[in-house]
A protein has these predicted regions:
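Domain-level signal for soluble alpha/beta catalytic cores
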Residues: 1-327
């Protein structure tokens, strides 16, 4: 398999899979069941989800281990180790025929008297390294607490390891712990042990696209994995708005805005990743003006104001207010 650093130098975006929990919860009788335990109890279902994403066109899959941090935080190292063991085995077996990369998926660790965040992350890194995993995604982070220690520990044990750190920011750029994405990105870029940095979860593709357009990434390799959209509750089920086609279009725009690594978070399914793969396979669109050689319209040009025309003409106007957030 091509070294991941070599792959990224080709300029081709690395497309990750989407949400494991969303797909697992949609299976009959699985709503409310912890999907990480599925690696132990229902391995055939977890493997089927991995393969569905690979068939959709992703080039990297995450191990089914997002909440292992919680097991370690409450002192249940045995369950954590069993989940990591089974999840690594499943992800590797599924990814190998497709030539896809396998990333250790590490979710946010809670603050705990029993186990500080830094130690939690380092213990997880050891579990994955001991099983031959060399690619790591630390995702949905509300802060960078413990990040420096993890990055240094990881590279001390395995210098060739590849580490992506990804923060969860709302559309205004803040995390739930009050940190700002730009600050977290800047501090992460300053750590030479971190290979890529970015954002995932909380926000839909439109808002993450608009957010990264205003960022100074400092030349970092940028990773962006938005939610499918924003959740609503329909018949006791959480449903995310946004079609796979729309998601794919926005992922392509996110790549054009500078991201090298993309994928999906909450609410995304193999259909969303297929939409992204299809959109990324298309050549960049060329505007009609550019293709015809016509001069672009001056920025100062004035277009017709249909609202003003209706008001001036005494016609009735209907105003509609949409509840934020929208995507």
């Amino acid at each position: 398999m091509t070294d991941i650093r070599t792959f990224l130098k080709t300029g081709e975006p690395l497309l990750f899979d989407g949400a494991m929990g969303t797909h697992f919860a949609a299976l009959p009788g699985r709503a409310g069941e912890r999907c990480e335990l599925g690696s132990l109890r229902r391995p055939e279902e977890i493997a089927a989800i991995h393969r569905a994403y690979l068939e959709a066109g992703c080039r990297a899959v995450k191990t089914n281990t997002f909440t292992v941090s919680l097991d370690l935080a409450r002192g249940d190292g045995e369950t954590a180790e069993r989940i990591v063991e089974a999840s690594c085995r499943l992800a590797r077996a599924c990814a190998e025929p497709y030539g896809a990369y396998v990333f250790a998926d590490i979710g946010p660790a809670p603050e705990s008297r029993l186990l500080p965040r830094a130690e939690n992350y380092c213990r997880q890194a050891d579990l994955f390294l001991d099983r031959g995993i060399r690619h790591f995604l630390l995702e949905t982070l509300p802060s960078d607490h413990g990040l420096r220690q993890l990055a240094q520990h990881l590279k001390a044990r395995c210098p060739e390891a590849y580490l992506i750190t990804s923060f969860a920011v709302s559309f205004d750029g803040a995390t739930r712990e009050g940190d700002f994405g730009q600050t977290l990105l800047r501090r992460s870029v300053a750590l030479e042990e971190i290979d890529a940095v970015g954002f995932n979860c909380v926000s839909g593709p439109h808002h993450l696209l608009e957010y990264i357009r205003g960022l100074d990434t400092g030349g970092a390799t940028l990773s962006v994995m938005p939610n499918a959209g924003y959740p609503t509750v329909q018949g006791r089920r959480t449903v995310f708005q946004g079609t796979p086609e729309y998601f794919g279009q926005k992922i392509a725009e996110i790549v054009q805005a500078g991201a090298s690594i993309v994928g999906g978070c909450c609410g995304t399914t193999p259909a969303h990743i297929a939409g992204a793969a299809e959109a990324l396979a298309k050549p960049r669109r060329v505007t009609a003006a550019a293709s015809s050689g016509a001069a672009p319209e001056p920025r100062g040009s004035v277009s017709a104001n249909t609202l003003a025309e209706k008001l001036d003409g005494g016609r009735r106007v209907v105003a509609v207010e949409l509840d934020p957030p929208t995507d």
